[in-house]
Amino acid sequence: MSTNDLPGQVALITGGGRGIGASIARELAAAGASVAVAARTREQVEEVARQIDGLAVEVDVTDREAVERMVTEVERELGPIDLLAANAGVGSVSGSLWESDPHEWWHVFEVNVLGVYLCCRAVLPRMLERGSGRIVITGSGGGYLPGSTNTAYSASKAAVNRLGETLAESLRQTPVRVFVFSPGLVQTEMTGDLSDDAPWTPPELAPHLVHVLASGRADELAGRYLHAEHDDIEDLIGRADEIQRSDLNSIRLRR
């Protein structure tokens, strides 16, 4: 992708302090966007923001008022938000459901599902009023292909996948577009030891399908967010349901 593809665009990335979110932030900045990097850990977002000359915002995405303040701050400092990447998520709480801690289990839902809801809820009225905007939600292949242990993560991502798909459908007649990006196993800090099994494959092309990066690394996946910004890909996205290399390396991009 060439540089300066998104001059004048303002992007807000939640969960932007590390992993996929940090890679998205760097890619968007390289394309010329003004980027706000948001996460709970200030040190992490400040470091990423420093690297890309962006805006660092400390936020708890489960706190409605904090999310509203975040959006207000970003638009005050950078201008109207053109792209929201709702990427914040957690993946802890493993083991059997019957041995899990209910508070820890629910925390996964609060971050992964409520966080996406609150962020979308905060930016959508502004986007609709302006008549433009893109929202990209990070789901997970785990929401379609459940694992045997982490029920909280799989169940929460199933909810995120459907939340995004339903939101996209409800906004189909508006100028605002919503995309759900659901990778398979990804080599990030969140996946921990599982990263050893995360696939590393080249992009796969298929007739009438969006060609997406099927790699499992955060830096490779980041480009998909940029591609979703461009109108010339929308016809393909509308015809693309799924590109799947294997059960553990599936990427769904739904509009």
What does each of the following model-derived ranges do?
Residues 98-117, 132, 136, 160:
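Catalytic Tyr-X3-Lys loop
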Residues 140:
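Residue(s) in the substrate-gating loop at a strand-loop-helix junction
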